Amino acid sequence: MTNKIVFPEPKQQVDFAFSLKRFRGIYLQNALLETVRDMDIVALDTQLAEYVNKADLATLATYGLRAELLFPVPVLLETNPFLLGYYRLLMGYSQKEFYGKDKGFNAGCFKSMEVKGNIGKVAKPKISELCHAFCSVASSLLQGVGPLRISRELLDDLTLLTVGPQLRGGANNQRGADGIVLVFEIIKEIVSHAVAEVRENAIEVNSATGRNVLIEFAPDPDIIIREEMSLDNYRNVVAIEVKSGTDVSNIHNRIGEAEKSHQKARGHGYTECWTVVNVSRLDMDKARKESPSTNRFYSITDLSLREGEQYEDFRRRVLSLTAISAAPTP
């Protein structure tokens, strides 16, 4: 009997497992305990007594917990700047809101501590202020979860609740980058017989017009095709937005994002705007309403086949708009 219920391989969870192992060694409770083990405990306790109110110290002592599990102090962050990530995760702040300029945290200067493990010149004199701010919200957290009986396990669970979305966001970003690279590689294959030069972020091809055509990675839109009219003077031809997310329920939000990018591209003179998606089902009528600037919608899956109606349409249009003849038949 053939089983009709088939699930995809849990690749993302496998990736998460390895990422979580790395997180535990750098940002989670394991890293904190390893750091404290090699520190001068007297110096640490002196600062904890200075930064943490007596009632909170007493509450933690009741449960046999050291205060640094919840409260950061300068000597600790100076010993291991990566631990800023632990306290950020524990308080439930995403990287975007904690370090972003538009959230009002004023914590952007500390990002290198979590990301690179070093304290910048601007951040160094503000470490004390950072710790006071953390200790204030940590006190609120301690009071708020008090009825649940505070424990190391609970604190570890709270950090993991913030890690999850961060890992998923990282996976989504990676999926997005992979999708852009895949579409770029497909274009590269289509024009390979006319390539004049391959650079890290661009392909230069010889067109039938005698002018160079550049196919490039770009920040917004994702891929652009431009024709060089003269030195440093280009005709903008094609703007391509790649939306690699596989969540069907979210695809129309992504198409809305593509529309914003294409509107900018139109403003810069691009004559063709394409949107490449990575979902199996797409309501084309709805998609066209959400992105009227998109001339053509393509599927990453169909393009990856290197054959079929969508791929052939994509191939013909790339060749036509770059003024390149088709590759000779072997």
Swiss-Prot record:
> Key word Magnesium present in the record?
yes
Annotated keywords = Endonuclease, Hydrolase, Magnesium, Nuclease, Restriction system
Q: Which domain of life is it from?
A: Bacteria
What chemistry does it catalyse, as a reaction equation? Endonucleolytic cleavage of DNA to give specific double-stranded fragments with terminal 5'-phosphates
**One annotated GO molecular function:** type II site-specific deoxyribonuclease activity
Q: Look up the record and name the cofactor or cofactors this protein needs.
A: Mg(2+)
A Gene Ontology annotation in the biological process aspect, one of them, is: DNA restriction-modification system
One Pfam family recorded for the sequence: RE_XcyI
Coiled-coil positions: none
Question: InterPro entries from the entry?
Answer: Restrct_endonuc_II_XcyI
Q: Return the EC number.
A: 3.1.21.4
Q: Which family does it belong to?
A: Belongs to the XcyI type II restriction endonuclease family.
Question: What protein name applies here?
Answer: Type II restriction enzyme Cfr9I
What is the species listed in this Swiss-Prot or TrEMBL entry?
Answer: Citrobacter freundii
